[in-house]
């Protein structure tokens, strides 16, 4: 039995903790805040509950597997429901496309109806190409440790597979090569933002998101996606995992190139055989590990080379429909601007708040997330530059004015927000940096803005012996499915007690 310390009670940390405890290890989780979940939280304000982090569950099989292998099935604990339709996309020219859930044929028909036969055929091409990419990348890239490119060179099918995933082709370039309808190109571009990236430079393999969403579906957890955090903490505790909340880790201690424990802010030293870091990798290697630890230098250099992911500016809106007419929205809604490229230019190059942002609205059709038939809870998110005072945008100022600007745009879209507004709370990238310990408020750690980006993420198994990294800033990346896979990779690397 190994004594394992997990730094951070996010989804990745708890998923790893549950698997390791089931494998016979003694596990303790240390969390800086007063609750588990990291960015994955459902929070109540007044009469409304909001998913303040992830608001969509894809690839639920990742968590079905986790719960099945550690105890009771997830279906016995959580009510996981398909969201139908999956998405509603709205464009500045007045066109609107609704993607049905779990039905590619129905999606093709919807696209043909709105955009014409060529567009429908184009989307079918997209899904077929995305499926082939997924088949190539899933096992050897996504579900395996990815420590270097060299082992991949031994693959006999490497040339064919590289041609399929097109590692040196950007998502935007692939859209252009396929001559996609401009409306569909915007939808494809948006997949880059799922990893905090710019579609003009992010690799084409992110197209796999289209296949995963359409084939494995879009799902909601009754009561909010944050219920997954609650269920994971409960599962961990059932398996004997201990939690210490409001406990800040000051340092991961390393002696002779091997971790030997952690030093807490209250000066307690906790010895351990292994440390699983669920904090942002940039924070782990630059703040928690001494600069004198040479084995960490390679990771520091990689992280320095990587482009940081974008952040987000969010609004939590509690709406009262007795005050005005209810807007007709689906669960997941996207409103694109006229000039989508300008958004990426302002975020990544100018590093300023987007003047005319794409707006995502999560408007759950979940009665357990509001008190009162007349109430609605909307989570509104726009992409934003990181919080970087001195070299970029300082998000400690101007948040209220930017929130008002977004509400005005929502009103101009005919969504009747101002007259129905019962509650408003906004969160800036600076807030995200503060409560999630995410440098600059980056949602996904590093972006995927180059062909080498996958190799610039933190390795799951560090060169510092006994140290493992899990979560959105480590391989294979951000988002609930990948974070769950990250935890499985780490648990398998550590093995049974």
Language-model features: locations:
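Short beta-strand to alpha-helix junction loop
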Residues: 162-171, 214-234, 394-402
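Mid-domain catalytic core of redox enzymes
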Residues: 220, 250-372
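Helical element adjacent to the flavin cofactor pocket in flavoenzyme catalytic cores
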Residues: 208-259
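N-terminal glycine-rich phosphate/pyrophosphate-binding loop and immediately adjacent elements
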Residues: 2-136, 448
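A glycine-rich dinucleotide-binding beta-alpha-beta segment and adjacent secondary-structure elements
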Residues: 181-195, 356-362, 416-476
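C-terminal segments that line or cap access tunnels to active or ligand-binding sites in enzymes
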Residues: 320-429, 433
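Rossmann-like flavin
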Residues: 92-202
